Design a protein with these regions (language model features):
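Catalytic His-Asp charge-relay segment
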Residues: 252-256
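N-terminal beta1-alpha1 cap of cysteine-dependent amidohydrolase-like domains
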Residues: 3-250, 260-378
Length: 378
């Protein structure tokens, strides 16, 4: 906690220096950072963190996939005007230090994985969180957005890995938000149109699918209430009050416990997900807010070719809903997944073709072994 506090002091000092140099208006804690329109990035690129294959998703595929990204998160970001770069798990700290300075923000998605799995979602999240803090402390602007499990991960990392979530019962629960009296002091809701606030406060438009909750008491017990602002709460099926929206008081880090991407892009049957015009409208608000935060980041890839090598368009998307998944579509990644090599890489077309053939052979063998025909696998 002391280390983060000192970084925050440095952030304030550096931001004040940036104010003098760039003419931006930077106001502390209870106020908002404003950046002149001319300096806004009109081509934001946002990273979305992959995660381990869930048991249910892995069981539906014979292929040896090791991680995935639900396509609804990709569409959520793209629908607000940004491009997406997948961020891999099971990588060294150096990888995250190298990729984040090219991006304008990171989305930590919801899902079904554990924080104690080695080299997985949470470990990658730790690297991302630390690098994001440094980028902001150095005078940049780098937002993080956590949805559901991603929101839980943000506070887990802020607590230096001390588990503070409570078991709760908020699965398949559509709710309005119970706003705090001072919620308008937040960056997330300071300029939200009254119509959006009215819908959020009165209609069952937030889709909740979580078995863990974070309460205000949890934050206070760890001293996190000094750094994080709670804007709204909700009650689970059993009457437990939990935090539903949160943001860091200085850093551009945001968390929501519900799933706005599901209202717009998930069509799984028998799920309590509202698809009314009002539900779509408020869900789009959250996407727009996050992407507009990312527009305040001036970081860039080296050039257009560099972006093209990294964007998620390079990877196929699967119709997982056809297999009764809770996601309509997913990007499924093998363990050796990577970004495309530069155009001037030393490999020639012949060696590339050979590598593709070898990869196909290895996948076929793994599939054969998984189907318990080991003796016939060659």
């Amino acid at each position: 906690m002391m280390a983060l506090s000192s970084k925050i002091v440095a952030l304030v000092a550096l931001n004040l220096l940036v104010t003098l140099v760039k003419g931006a208006t930077v106001i502390l804690i209870e106020e908002e950072i404003e950046i002149p329109r001319a300096s806004l990035n009109e081509e934001p690129v946002i990273g979305i963190l992959a995660q381990e294959m869930s048991y249910s998703l892995a069981a539906k595929y014979e292929e040896d996939y090791e991680s995935y990204i639900a396509a609804s998160y990709v569409k959520f970001v793209e629908g607000a005007g940004a491009r997406v770069v997948p961020i891999w798990i099971n990588k060294s700290r150096e990888y995250y230090e190298n990729i984040l300075p090219n991006l304008n923000g990171v989305l930590l998605p919801g899902g079904a994985t554990w924080f104690n799995q080695s080299n997985g979602y949470a470990d990658a999240g730790r690297h991302i969180y630390d690098v994001a803090v440094e980028l902001n402390v150095q005078g940049g602007y780098f937002p993080l957005w956590g949805t559901c499990l991603g929101f839980e991960l943000l506070t887990y990392l802020a607590a230096n890995g001390e588990e503070h979530r409570e078991h709760c019962s908020s699965n398949n629960q559509a709710l309005p938000l119970d706003f705090k009296p001072d919620f308008r002091k937040s960056r997330m809701f300071a300029d939200t149109p009254d119509e959006i606030i009215e819908i959020l406060a009165s209609e069952d438009v937030t889709a909740n699918f979580h078995q863990y909750c974070i309460t205000e008491q949890n934050l206070t017990a760890l001293g996190l209430d000094e750094e994080w602002r709670v804007m709204s709460t909700n009650m689970d099926w059993n009457g437990l009050e939990f935090i539903s929206t949160i943001e860091h008081k200085i850093l551009p880090f945001y968390g929501i416990q519900f799933h706005p991407e599901k209202n717009i892009y998930e069509w799984v049957r028998n799920k309590n997900i509202s698809h009314t015009p009002n539900a779509i409208k408020v869900s789009q608000y959250f996407a727009d807010f996050f992407v507009n935060e990312a527009r305040k980041s001036e970081q860039r890839f080296q050039d257009a070719d560099d972006i093209d090598r990294h964007v998620i368009y390079n990877y196929p998307v699967s119709f997982t809903g056809l297999k009764k998944s809770s996601f309509e579509q997913c990007y499924l990644f093998e363990g050796n997944v990577d970004y495309l090599a530069p155009a001037d890489a030393s490999k020639d077309q012949g060696s590339d073709a050979s590598a593709l053939v070898q990869r196909y052979v290895e996948r076929s063998k793994k599939k054969c072994i998984k189907n318990k025909r080991r003796n016939s696998c060659k």
